[in-house]
Protein backbone atom coordinates (compact mmCIF):
# COMPACT_ATOMS: atom_id res chain seq x y z
CA UNK A 1 0.00 0.00 0.00
CA UNK A 2 1.58 3.27 -1.18
CA UNK A 3 0.49 5.57 1.64
CA UNK A 4 2.67 8.46 0.43
CA UNK A 5 0.61 8.69 -2.78
CA UNK A 6 -2.79 8.13 -1.19
CA UNK A 7 -5.83 10.20 -2.14
CA UNK A 8 -7.80 11.87 0.65
CA UNK A 9 -11.49 10.94 0.75
CA UNK A 10 -13.53 12.65 3.44
CA UNK A 11 -16.72 10.87 4.54
CA UNK A 12 -19.32 12.39 6.88
CA UNK A 13 -21.73 10.25 8.92
CA UNK A 14 -25.23 11.75 9.20
CA UNK A 15 -28.49 10.64 10.73
CA UNK A 16 -30.62 10.78 13.85
CA UNK A 17 -29.36 10.38 17.38
CA UNK A 18 -28.65 6.77 18.40
CA UNK A 19 -29.04 5.10 14.99
CA UNK A 20 -25.55 3.60 15.29
CA UNK A 21 -23.25 6.02 13.47
CA UNK A 22 -20.52 6.07 16.11
CA UNK A 23 -20.73 2.32 16.72
CA UNK A 24 -20.39 1.67 13.00
CA UNK A 25 -17.32 3.89 12.82
CA UNK A 26 -15.73 2.12 15.78
CA UNK A 27 -16.28 -1.30 14.23
CA UNK A 28 -14.82 -0.23 10.87
CA UNK A 29 -11.80 1.28 12.63
CA UNK A 30 -11.21 -2.02 14.41
CA UNK A 31 -11.78 -0.67 17.90
CA UNK A 32 -13.56 -2.33 20.78
CA UNK A 33 -16.90 -0.74 21.49
CA UNK A 34 -19.16 -1.01 24.51
CA UNK A 35 -22.62 -1.47 22.99
CA UNK A 36 -24.24 -0.58 26.31
CA UNK A 37 -22.70 2.89 26.43
CA UNK A 38 -24.73 6.06 25.93
CA UNK A 39 -25.00 7.64 22.50
CA UNK A 40 -22.11 9.85 21.46
CA UNK A 41 -22.32 13.62 21.80
CA UNK A 42 -19.94 15.82 19.85
CA UNK A 43 -17.83 15.47 16.72
CA UNK A 44 -15.01 13.01 16.19
CA UNK A 45 -13.03 11.65 13.28
CA UNK A 46 -10.56 8.93 12.45
CA UNK A 47 -8.34 8.06 9.50
CA UNK A 48 -7.92 4.66 7.90
CA UNK A 49 -5.95 3.71 4.80
CA UNK A 50 -7.65 1.33 2.37
CA UNK A 51 -7.18 0.27 -1.25
CA UNK A 52 -9.97 0.94 -3.74
CA UNK A 53 -9.59 0.09 -7.44
CA UNK A 54 -5.82 -0.31 -6.96
CA UNK A 55 -5.63 3.19 -5.50
CA UNK A 56 -4.52 3.84 -1.93
CA UNK A 57 -7.14 5.96 -0.19
CA UNK A 58 -6.70 7.94 3.00
CA UNK A 59 -10.24 7.67 4.31
CA UNK A 60 -11.05 10.42 6.80
CA UNK A 61 -14.31 9.60 8.57
CA UNK A 62 -16.17 12.38 10.39
CA UNK A 63 -18.84 11.38 12.88
CA UNK A 64 -21.48 13.93 13.86
CA UNK A 65 -22.31 11.82 16.90
CA UNK A 66 -25.03 13.44 18.96
CA UNK A 67 -24.32 16.94 17.70
CA UNK A 68 -27.49 16.87 15.59
CA UNK A 69 -29.56 17.08 18.81
CA UNK A 70 -28.34 20.63 19.29
CA UNK A 71 -28.52 21.68 15.62
CA UNK A 72 -25.01 23.11 15.74
CA UNK A 73 -23.68 21.63 12.51
CA UNK A 74 -22.11 24.42 10.47
CA UNK A 75 -21.16 24.86 6.83
CA UNK A 76 -17.45 24.50 7.63
CA UNK A 77 -18.12 20.97 8.90
CA UNK A 78 -18.98 19.82 5.38
CA UNK A 79 -16.10 21.56 3.61
CA UNK A 80 -14.23 19.24 1.21
CA UNK A 81 -16.63 16.37 1.84
CA UNK A 82 -16.26 13.56 -0.71
CA UNK A 83 -19.26 11.44 0.28
CA UNK A 84 -21.88 11.11 3.02
CA UNK A 85 -23.15 8.00 4.79
CA UNK A 86 -26.79 8.68 5.65
CA UNK A 87 -28.03 6.49 8.53
CA UNK A 88 -31.38 5.36 9.86
CA UNK A 89 -32.37 2.44 12.08
CA UNK A 90 -34.60 -0.26 10.58
CA UNK A 91 -36.64 -0.38 13.80
CA UNK A 92 -37.22 3.38 13.95
CA UNK A 93 -39.79 4.87 11.58
CA UNK A 94 -38.94 8.42 12.62
CA UNK A 95 -35.25 8.02 11.84
CA UNK A 96 -36.18 6.90 8.32
CA UNK A 97 -38.57 9.82 7.84
CA UNK A 98 -35.84 12.21 9.01
CA UNK A 99 -33.39 11.21 6.29
CA UNK A 100 -35.15 13.75 4.07
CA UNK A 101 -34.24 16.42 6.60
CA UNK A 102 -30.62 15.28 6.76
CA UNK A 103 -30.43 15.06 3.00
CA UNK A 104 -31.75 18.61 2.73
CA UNK A 105 -29.34 19.83 5.41
CA UNK A 106 -26.24 18.42 3.77
CA UNK A 107 -27.07 18.67 0.10
CA UNK A 108 -29.07 21.87 -0.18
CA UNK A 109 -28.24 24.13 2.75
CA UNK A 110 -24.55 23.35 2.42
CA UNK A 111 -24.39 23.28 -1.39
CA UNK A 112 -23.54 19.59 -1.64
CA UNK A 113 -26.49 18.60 -3.79
CA UNK A 114 -24.50 16.51 -6.24
CA UNK A 115 -22.12 14.91 -3.80
CA UNK A 116 -22.43 11.11 -3.52
CA UNK A 117 -24.38 9.55 -0.67
CA UNK A 118 -24.76 5.99 0.62
CA UNK A 119 -27.97 5.14 2.49
CA UNK A 120 -27.47 2.87 5.52
CA UNK A 121 -30.23 0.96 7.33
CA UNK A 122 -28.60 -0.10 10.59
CA UNK A 123 -29.50 -2.61 13.35
CA UNK A 124 -30.67 -5.47 11.11
CA UNK A 125 -29.52 -7.82 13.88
CA UNK A 126 -32.75 -6.97 15.72
CA UNK A 127 -35.58 -9.54 15.56
CA UNK A 128 -37.49 -9.37 12.29
CA UNK A 129 -40.72 -8.41 14.04
CA UNK A 130 -39.07 -5.18 15.18
CA UNK A 131 -38.19 -4.12 11.64
CA UNK A 132 -40.51 -1.34 10.44
CA UNK A 133 -38.48 -0.20 7.42
CA UNK A 134 -38.10 -2.75 4.62
CA UNK A 135 -35.35 -2.96 2.04
CA UNK A 136 -37.91 -2.14 -0.65
CA UNK A 137 -38.93 1.09 1.13
CA UNK A 138 -35.32 2.23 1.44
CA UNK A 139 -34.44 1.39 -2.17
CA UNK A 140 -37.55 3.24 -3.31
CA UNK A 141 -36.35 6.33 -1.45
CA UNK A 142 -32.98 6.10 -3.21
CA UNK A 143 -34.64 5.75 -6.60
CA UNK A 144 -36.99 8.68 -5.96
CA UNK A 145 -34.13 10.99 -4.95
CA UNK A 146 -32.18 9.99 -8.04
CA UNK A 147 -35.12 10.81 -10.31
CA UNK A 148 -36.39 13.91 -8.51
CA UNK A 149 -33.04 15.66 -8.24
CA UNK A 150 -31.46 14.25 -11.41
CA UNK A 151 -28.37 13.23 -9.45
CA UNK A 152 -25.21 12.32 -11.31
CA UNK A 153 -24.57 9.46 -8.85
CA UNK A 154 -27.04 6.74 -7.95
CA UNK A 155 -27.61 6.15 -4.22
CA UNK A 156 -26.66 2.64 -3.06
CA UNK A 157 -28.44 1.14 -0.06
CA UNK A 158 -26.94 -1.24 2.50
CA UNK A 159 -28.51 -2.99 5.47
CA UNK A 160 -25.98 -3.18 8.28
CA UNK A 161 -25.37 -4.40 11.79
CA UNK A 162 -22.57 -2.79 13.76
CA UNK A 163 -23.19 -5.34 16.51
CA UNK A 164 -22.63 -8.33 14.21
CA UNK A 165 -20.28 -6.55 11.79
CA UNK A 166 -22.57 -6.99 8.77
CA UNK A 167 -21.78 -4.88 5.69
CA UNK A 168 -19.67 -2.44 7.72
CA UNK A 169 -16.61 -2.59 5.46
CA UNK A 170 -18.88 -2.54 2.43
CA UNK A 171 -20.46 0.84 3.19
CA UNK A 172 -17.13 2.57 3.72
CA UNK A 173 -15.57 1.03 0.63
CA UNK A 174 -18.65 2.05 -1.35
CA UNK A 175 -18.31 5.61 -0.01
CA UNK A 176 -14.62 5.68 -0.93
CA UNK A 177 -15.34 4.39 -4.43
CA UNK A 178 -18.02 7.04 -4.97
CA UNK A 179 -15.67 9.68 -3.56
CA UNK A 180 -13.00 8.72 -6.10
CA UNK A 181 -15.53 8.87 -8.93
CA UNK A 182 -16.60 12.30 -7.73
CA UNK A 183 -13.01 13.54 -7.78
CA UNK A 184 -12.58 12.28 -11.36
CA UNK A 185 -15.88 13.89 -12.35
CA UNK A 186 -14.90 17.26 -10.86
CA UNK A 187 -11.42 17.14 -12.39
CA UNK A 188 -12.89 16.42 -15.82
CA UNK A 189 -15.31 19.33 -15.40
CA UNK A 190 -12.49 21.63 -14.33
CA UNK A 191 -10.39 20.58 -17.32
CA UNK A 192 -13.32 21.15 -19.67
CA UNK A 193 -13.96 24.57 -18.16
CA UNK A 194 -10.26 25.39 -18.42
CA UNK A 195 -10.14 24.35 -22.07
CA UNK A 196 -13.33 26.24 -22.87
CA UNK A 197 -12.05 29.37 -21.15
CA UNK A 198 -8.74 29.13 -22.98
CA UNK A 199 -10.59 28.72 -26.25
CA UNK A 200 -12.78 31.75 -25.53
CA UNK A 201 -9.79 33.82 -24.45
CA UNK A 202 -7.87 32.70 -27.50
CA UNK A 203 -10.71 33.72 -29.80
CA UNK A 204 -10.89 37.12 -28.11
CA UNK A 205 -7.14 37.63 -28.55
CA UNK A 206 -7.34 36.68 -32.22
CA UNK A 207 -10.24 39.06 -32.75
CA UNK A 208 -8.38 41.85 -30.97
CA UNK A 209 -5.35 41.33 -33.16
CA UNK A 210 -7.57 41.39 -36.24
CA UNK A 211 -9.18 44.61 -35.06
CA UNK A 212 -5.77 46.20 -34.56
CA UNK A 213 -4.84 45.44 -38.14
CA UNK A 214 -8.07 46.66 -39.70
CA UNK A 215 -8.17 49.76 -41.92
CA UNK A 216 -11.31 51.81 -41.73
CA UNK A 217 -12.23 54.05 -44.71
CA UNK A 218 -14.11 57.11 -43.54
From Swiss-Prot:
It is a lipid-anchor. Keywords: Cell membrane, GTP-binding, Lipoprotein, Membrane, Methylation, Nucleotide-binding, Prenylation. It comes from the Eukaryota. One of its GO terms (biological process) is hypotonic response. Disulfide bonds: none annotated. Its main location: membrane. Belongs to the small GTPase superfamily. Rab family. This is Ras-related protein RabO. It comes from Dictyostelium discoideum (Social amoeba).
Amino acid sequence: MDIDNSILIRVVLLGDYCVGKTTTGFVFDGKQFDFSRNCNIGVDFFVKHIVVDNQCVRLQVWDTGGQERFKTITRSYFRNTSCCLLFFSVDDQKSFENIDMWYSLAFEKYDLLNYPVVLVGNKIDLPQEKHVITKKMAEEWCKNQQTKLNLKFSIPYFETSAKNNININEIFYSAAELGLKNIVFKNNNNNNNYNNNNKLNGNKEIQNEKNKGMCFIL
